[in-house]
Amino acid sequence: MSRLSWGYREHNGPIHWKEFFPIADGDQQSPIEIKTKEVKYDSSLRPLSIKYDPSSAKIISNSGHSFNVDFDDTENKSVLRGGPLTGSYRLRQVHLHWGSADDHGSEHIVDGVSYAAELHVVHWNSDKYPSFVEAAHEPDGLAVLGVFLQIGEPNSQLQKITDTLDSIKEKGKQTRFTNFDLLSLLPPSWDYWTYPGSLTVPPLLESVTWIVLKQPINISSQQLAKFRSLLCTAEGEAAAFLVSNHRPPQPLKGRKVRASFH
């Protein structure tokens, strides 16, 4: 494995990441297991304020690690405010983590229970920093909204994504993707847990305020299977499916998880 060739297979998966990214063993790594008995309700946490403009979605691509929807983040068109955050955090990207079967796949775990998948909505602190790249190195630089997915009815909001997957099957492929109503993908309740953590993929930077929504959204088993049909290999390489792309929970190391709800 080299710095660039990390992944989720046996030879380059999460247990190997620390060889090139020593922060993998750091004090504020993500994901974690949320143990609800140890979580403290914090009355100072505000409700989330979310404004997402569907026209700010630009491209969907296959990174070899997930699909990514990238958003135009040149101005505050789509922003996350409130909650545990100070100032405005601009929407940058959305991606998904899943497992090889429907009974696991989320990165965060709640009281020992895994969900089928977990959507990550990545934002950066545009009030304090000039770009995502610079914000990613600062302790208050990023905010990631985590949304759990459970198996249930087909999700019509996810269909727009699953319909494009055939055109980005191989790593490195991308296609235009706009008018994506991300707000309608979120669950009705925005109750959340929050804690200081990291990116869950290399470079694993400890710059993330995590906001994990308690209420899951639905995905059908058939929709989820579409994601496993993506390849983690590029055109011309020996094809390998991206059957699983989640990092296991990391030690809490004294961090406190707070809840916005009783």
Curated annotation (Swiss-Prot):
Residues 4-261 form the Alpha-carbonic anhydrase domain. The active site is at 65 (proton donor/acceptor). Inhibited by acetazolamide. It catalyses: hydrogencarbonate + H(+) = CO2 + H2O. Expressed in thymus, small intestine, spleen, prostate, ovary, colon and testis. Its EC number is 4.2.1.1. The keyword Nucleotide-binding does not apply. Keywords: Lyase, Metal-binding, Zinc. Substrate binds at residues 200-201. InterPro entries: CA_dom (IPR001148), CA_dom_sf (IPR036398), Carbonic_anhydrase_a-class (IPR023561), Carbonic_anhydrase_a-class_CS (IPR018338). Zn(2+) binds at residues 95, 97, 120. It holds the Pfam family Carb_anhydrase. GO terms for molecular function: carbonate dehydratase activity; zinc ion binding. GO terms for cellular component: cytoplasm; cytosol; intracellular membrane-bounded organelle; myelin sheath. Its cofactor is Zn(2+). Reversible hydration of carbon dioxide. Belongs to the alpha-carbonic anhydrase family. This is Carbonic anhydrase 13. It comes from Homo sapiens (Human).
